[in-house]
Amino acid sequence: MIKRVALAFSLLLSSILPATAGDVNVPVEAYKLKNGLRVILSRDNAVPVVTVYMIYDVGARSEEKGRTGFAHLFEHMMFEGSANAPKGVHNKMVESNGGVFNGSTHPDFTDYYEVIPSNKLATALWLESDRMRNLSINEENLKNQKEAVKQERRLSFDNQPYNTAIVDVWPTLMFHNWQSSHSLIGSFEDLNGATLADVSKFFKTYYAPDNAALVIVGDIQNAEAKKLIETYFGDIPSQPIPKRPDLTEPADFKAVTQVQKDPLAQVPAVILGYPGPKRRSPDYYALHMIDAILTGGDSSRFKLDLVKGKESIISYEAELGWPFASARDYRDPEPYAMFLVYKPNFTAAQIVDQAQEEIAKLQNQPVDAKELERVKTLVRAGAIKEMQSSQNRAQALAQFELADGNAELINTELDRVLAVTPAQIQAAAKKYLLPEKRAVLEIQPAPAQAPKGGN
């Protein structure tokens, strides 16, 4: 399912990867099958478990007009059975072996994983290859999953505070290109209009070996894993690689403010967003550090100055890529955005000014070396904890491979973040985090209305 970011700093940590500078050493063996499937193996024999992670180069920003929500719908369809593993078999085979599985839709990717005992690696590979080869696409499955997606939207978005504003309204303010500005969840109208032919075309276009990467992390012998991968995936036909959508945004972003009434909100909130830098550019890493300074941990500036000092903010989230993803989940462009829930005795304008004042401090004076070192220590420690999960490592390897063409970047990203200087932080804050290049969405409580439905 698509998930809203819950704690942005934890996503920052998962974006920048583990260990101290110079100490990151994730084993990486990358190669490609004849049909174009990219494979990354990362051996870790600490425990007898493997993570099998399949990522497809298609996300919500790949969708066409009139077909919003297709990426998410197809994530659901992938669990409806395949030629040799009918509906329910995938779940049963993984869970009966003590494993777990899931899938998720991102702006630019869709991923699926199994975490399973290492002696059942062949089982997970067979399941993934069978649904890549021949997914069960029929009217019954399509109808069922249309309803499942609509019900998920009702429960998780339409009938939760703030979420409708976040998924439907916020992208229209932050982006001008339709590929990024449309609702990543999709509309009931488009879901209802989805035909079997539409879904079959989507599968054939995007769910092909040369539009995917397979990552295996854990207790494996690489030579044996390669034999299994060739057995299960080697003869799946490739397809013409789909053209990526043009995600270019206008260079002259102009400030915009909008007010949205929310009958489910008990207290007001405001979102601030700024167009961000190019992926993996020096400014990209500087903005990571800016976010950590502003919102990372109990000693962050927002926590000390706004939550405790002015006592105006109740809670906050922030991240490059907020709200639908972490920074790694996006190709360019990705904004830097923050979500601030505040006390009703303040106005939205006051909260916006307070947040911008904290940014102005970074623009007007280089961050103190002692504070920066403290933040880097926090980043380092959090990154180590984050990457103890083989699933997180697998996701990072997969996303670096698809977005950047190099899974081995997992071993250098932390160094780049920790190398950011006070001067780079100040320059990036001056370049990107400007009021005249800022989108603002004020979310105000409103009188209760009848619950939203849709069909």
In which residue ranges do the predicted regions lie?
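Short amphipathic alpha-helices in soluble, non-transmembrane regions
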Residues: 126-131, 227-232, 351-357
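Non-catalytic, conformational "gating/processing" segments within enzyme and secreted inhibitor domains
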Residues: 139, 146, 154-155, 200-232, ...
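Positively charged n-region of N-terminal signal peptides that target proteins for export
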Residues: 1-4
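Short pre-active-site segment immediately N-terminal to the catalytic Zn-binding motif
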Residues: 59-67
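Bacterial N-terminal signal peptides
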Residues: 6-16
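Non-catalytic beta-strand/loop surface segments
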Residues: 19-60, 86-120, 156-211, 235-281, ...
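Short, polar/flexible loop-turn hinges at active-site or ligand-entry regions and domain interfaces
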Residues: 80-84, 132-141, 367
